[in-house]
Amino acid sequence: MSKRDYYEILGVTKTATEGEMKVAFRKLAMTYHPDRNPGDKDAEIKFKEINEAYQCLSDGQKRAAYDRFGHAAFSQGGGGPGFGNEFGDFMSDIFDNFFGDGRGGGGARGRGGTPGRERGADLRYNLEITLEEAFTGKAETIKIPTSITCEVCDGSGAKPGSKPRTCPTCAGYGRVRAAQGFFAIERTCPNCHGRGEIVDDPCTACQGAGRVNRERTLSINVPAGVDDGLRIRLAGEGESGLRGGPAGDLYVFLSIKQHEFFQRDGADLFCRVPISMVTAALSGEITVPVIDGSQTQVRIPAGTQTAKQFRIKGKGMPVLRSREVGDLYIQVFVETPQNLTKRQRELLQEFDLSASPENHPESAGFFSKVRDFFGGAVRP
């Protein structure tokens, strides 16, 4: 049975670049991989065929020979493009995608890397501040429990005067490759657990861990205008890495205490202020607080009703990393008098008897509509 053309198998032209062939191969390999098609013999055959085609065409010399002589270039014991070690590096990337055992961010040594380099863990710190502190910004000193590199063994985990030996199982790579059928799977070394080294005489200060627990003091700059839930990242301030690996990051999550007077919406502030019935009816001025600690005057016009809102421009919160500032909104509510004296009651009753619909336009309009609805007299 004649073999199919390698270019046809990969779905590329004879002028395809190495990058185009690699993209085509990766797509086909993931489609027909046996793990995605368990028990499918056709997919298994197709997968082998794709591997064979790519190994030939990804090699410059083999591709030149194939372009000139076709499949005959590898016949007569020519050692055709099977599934050899020269193909293993690329397939290892494919297997990482399938089995989730990738090398990103540390762990075991990759090809040509450093044995056992492991990135330190990220840390989280919750910081609560006041609204005033969010307005001005602040420098905060915090203490965090964390792991740092052991100073006695310098992070090696070995007792001073000794040093780790190369793991004989993985030859220092931290990973071992096992054959399963016609392909290989790369796993973390079970002997050294990915370190690539064996510590025979552990450091007594860190018990061979390479790190010790300590409390660290850090200074954090909280900028003006921060909002509730904001996250501040401090690169490299997390746990120390292992065996020369990079440190993790520290994430500071901000929460803002509820304020006694102000509610916040973005850069704007809102404040509810009580006013007397007389001020609402006759007009007047009220003094209201501002977030910067000062006070300002607000003119209340005659006839002001509850829920009337007044805007004070530029008295809100600063916008983070900007020169813009929000506004302050004052919402008034008319306070009903309580604990009245006899004389006060008489005065209010006299006012009520002398009042006309023009004094209460909303009430008059409402009860007029109710009267029309029910078709009868309705007394306010």
From Swiss-Prot:
Residue ranges of every copy of the J domain listed in the record: 5-70
Keywords from the UniProt entry: Chaperone, Cytoplasm, DNA replication, Metal-binding, Repeat, Stress response, Zinc, Zinc-finger
Gene3D superfamilies cross-referenced by the UniProt entry: DnaJ domain, Heat shock protein DnaJ, cysteine-rich domain, Urease metallochaperone UreE, N-terminal domain
Zinc finger (CR-type): 137-215
Cellular compartment(s): Cytoplasm
Superkingdom classification of source: Bacteria
Major subcellular site: cytoplasm
Residues bound to Zn(2+) 2: 167, 170, 189, 192
Cofactor: Zn(2+)
GO terms for MF: ATP binding; heat shock protein binding; unfolded protein binding; zinc ion binding
Quaternary data: Homodimer.
Stated family: Belongs to the DnaJ family.
Protein's name according to its UniProt entry: Chaperone protein DnaJ
The gene coding this protein: dnaJ
